[in-house]
């Protein structure tokens, strides 16, 4: 079978070694004669999977002991509601920084539960899209928390600064598309959440890291399935969890640890991004309209000089084993999502194709 590189923004490519192990264990897991999908989530075998996954995740991100790690449902969109429902307490407003599509979507959901103070951080610098630095973000005095999205998958915009707003500001962040791709100082945040389907594992699982002093404040109307305290008190097994996604994510964590951890991923991700952006920047045939300081290393949108060639580019790239390069419907063009599981070899194959395509059609 020819090598296929999947550049989908999510569900995204998984490490080949992880898929191979899952395939080998699919029908007979741990010698039980059954699949991990078929065992009880409350049985000792799966409890061990759950505990190891949490330990490995904590190790990878150096999660402090005063933070709880929850394995939840509902994806990022579920957390758009869960954050205000759990963290507002008796306050009625929260600060929301708008830097792109997903931040704006979180704001729309938050308006159901509070009156958000929205700060538009989007700017244009020399004709390129950018984000105002954190020192210019205007926060209110009475907000329960401040929410932002460090990586916008559709816009291809990243905010790599570490929050430093003082100990009284509870920072909540949507790390769905950048979790585990670079080191982060968890202690600077009150809540970090991430849908699994990009850098963690299969769709269906959502991981929440929450500082323990923020528990116990849920709105009385908060659905139990979104209540952080309930999930924490029940070991993330308030109801039947997505066990297969949890198991596979655990395999990904072990793969990450065996391959140098987050620090090594950070180096490789930088190499991949530099390679791809280098081809784009050194060409008049391709373009990216994000300022270099805010370019995403995970999601690289680009356009062809002649959009009439888009269809041919997608057809030929697919035939070459480079899949899922079509840009989001909101922005069009192309998009290469190059998460942890995408090897440098895959980005090299893409850039080689891009150079050759330009040679023939430029």
From Swiss-Prot:
Gene3D superfamilies, sorted: Aspartate Aminotransferase, domain 1, Type I PLP-dependent aspartate aminotransferase-like (Major domain)
CC terms in the record's Gene Ontology section: cytoplasm
Major subcellular location class: cytoplasm
Protein's pathway: Amino-acid biosynthesis; L-serine biosynthesis; L-serine from 3-phospho-D-glycerate: step 2/3; Cofactor biosynthesis; pyridoxine 5'-phosphate biosynthesis; pyridoxine 5'-phosphate from D-erythrose 4-phosphate: step 3/5
One Pfam match: Aminotran_5
Residues annotated as binding L-glutamate: 9, 42
One record GO biological process: pyridoxine biosynthetic process
InterPro entries, per the entry: Aminotrans_V_dom (IPR000192), Aminotrans_V_PyrdxlP_BS (IPR020578), Pser_aminoTfrase (IPR022278), PyrdxlP-dep_Trfase (IPR015424), PyrdxlP-dep_Trfase_major (IPR015421), PyrdxlP-dep_Trfase_small (IPR015422)
Locations listed in the record: Cytoplasm
EC number(s) reported in the record: 2.6.1.52
Function: Catalyzes the reversible conversion of 3-phosphohydroxypyruvate to phosphoserine and of 3-hydroxy-2-oxo-4-phosphonooxybutanoate to phosphohydroxythreonine.
HAMAP family named in the record: SerC_aminotrans_5
Protein name: Phosphoserine aminotransferase
Organism this protein belongs to: Shigella boydii serotype 18 (strain CDC 3083-94 / BS512)
């Amino acid at each position: 079978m020819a090598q296929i590189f999947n550049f989908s923004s999510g569900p995204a490519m998984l490490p080949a070694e992880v898929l191979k192990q899952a395939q080998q264990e699919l029908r007979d897991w741990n010698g039980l004669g059954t699949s991990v999908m078929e065992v009880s989530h409350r049985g000792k075998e799966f409890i061990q999977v759950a505990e190891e996954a949490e330990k490995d995740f904590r190790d990878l991100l150096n999660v402090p002991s005063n933070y709880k790690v929850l394995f939840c449902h509902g994806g990022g969109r579920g957390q758009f509601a869960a954050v205000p429902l759990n963290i507002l307490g008796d306050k009625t407003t929260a600060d929301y920084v708008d830097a792109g599509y997903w931040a704006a979507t979180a704001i729309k959901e938050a308006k159901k539960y509070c009156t958000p103070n929205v700060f538009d951080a989007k700017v244009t610098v020399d004709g390129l899209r950018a984000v105002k630095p954190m020192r210019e973000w205007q926060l209110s005095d009475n907000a329960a928390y401040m929410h932002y999205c460090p990586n916008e998958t559709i816009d291809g915009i990243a905010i790599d600064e570490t929050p430093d707003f003082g100990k009284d500001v509870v920072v909540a962040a949507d790390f769905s598309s950048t979790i585990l791709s670079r080191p982060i100082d968890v202690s600077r945040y009150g809540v970090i959440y991430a849908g699994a389907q990009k850098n963690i594992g299969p769709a269906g699982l959502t991981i929440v890291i929450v500082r323990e002093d923020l528990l116990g404040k849920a709105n009385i109307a908060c659905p139990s399935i979104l209540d952080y305290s309930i999930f924490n008190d029940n070991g993330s097994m308030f109801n039947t969890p997505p066990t297969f996604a949890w198991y596979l994510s655990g395999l990904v964590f072990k793969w990450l640890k065996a391959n140098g951890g987050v620090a090594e991923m950070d180096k490789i991700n930088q190499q991949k991004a530099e390679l791809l952006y280098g081809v784009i920047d050194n060409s008049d045939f391709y373009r990216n309209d994000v300022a270099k300081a805010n370019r995403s290393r995970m999601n690289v949108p680009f356009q062809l000089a002649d959009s009439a060639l888009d269809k041919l580019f997608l057809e030929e790239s697919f035939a070459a084993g480079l899949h899922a390069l079509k840009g989001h419907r909101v922005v069009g063009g192309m998009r290469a999502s190059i998460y942890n599981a995408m090897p440098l070899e895959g980005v090299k194959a893409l850039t080689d194709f891009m150079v050759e395509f330009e040679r023939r059609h430029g």
